[in-house]
Amino acid sequence: MVEMNFKVDAFEGPLDLLLHLIGQLEVDIYDIPMAEITDQYMEFVHTMQEMELDVASEYLVMAATLLAIKSKMLLPKQELEIDYDTLEEEEDPRDALVEKLMEYKRFKEAAKELKEKEAERSFYFSKPPMDLAEYDDGTKVAELDVSLNDMLSAFNKMLRRKKLNKPLHTRITTQEISIDERMDSVLGKLHQQVNHRLRFDELFEEQTKEQLVVTFLALLELMKRKLVEVEQAESFADLYVQGKGEELS
């Protein structure tokens, strides 16, 4: 018999103790030698009682279970006339115990893995979120009545139309213009209208391709600043730019 050498409080329950005993004997968990395991388990329980320690009821229940399994396996098998047509494999008395042990072992291994991950995580330190209130100027991004895809589609359609109408011979002149200047230009055109409203393509008349791009970017910036909004009555209808704000008063 393997020498008993473990602390009484080293186990989390009877299944934990059984796994320890099986490990000491170095036997297959699916082929537990019940006589030897039961004897060692009972020795553990007796040791606890001799030390006047409270023996948890779960240990006593397991002791009774082990003794019952041991008794079943020691009973002589009756020699019966065998009908091989209806022969079924006799159930092993240890099956239920083995199933519980395997389930407990899986949980124990999972708990060990989680503990290792917790130890790894302890080496990382999270930085609390910064207060960015001082960087908030209160400006909110304008909610578009039309999507950016709608605007890009209208812009590309306008570029194709201008390309078709472009004369065969043109004189190219370089004229740099900033987005801020074009924003003022767009607001100026809207201000000239009674209702401060223009059709989208009316903002892009008589311009080079480069100027068209600058105008489009200026329009996006004006929308961001909530100085204008782009509207569309229904899907695939013309886009309209509506001025708003004190700049148009």
Curated annotation (Swiss-Prot):
One biological process term in Gene Ontology: cell division
Gene (UniProt): scpA
Keyword field contains Nucleus: no
GO cellular component, one term: cytoplasm
A Pfam entry, by short name: SMC_ScpA
Subunit structure: Component of a cohesin-like complex composed of ScpA, ScpB and the Smc homodimer, in which ScpA and ScpB bind to the head domain of Smc. The presence of the three proteins is required for the association of the complex with DNA.
Record's keyword terms, sorted: Cell cycle, Cell division, Chromosome partition, Cytoplasm
Family as reported in the entry's similarity comment: Belongs to the ScpA family.
The name this protein goes by in its record: Segregation and condensation protein A
Source taxon at top rank: Bacteria
Record's subcellular location: Cytoplasm
Protein's job: Participates in chromosomal partition during cell division. May act via the formation of a condensin-like complex containing Smc and ScpB that pull DNA away from mid-cell into both cell halves.
InterPro entries tied to this protein: ScpA (IPR003768), ScpA-like_C (IPR023093)
HAMAP family: ScpA
NCBIfam families given in the database record: PRK00104.1-4
Species for this entry: Listeria monocytogenes serotype 4a (strain HCC23)
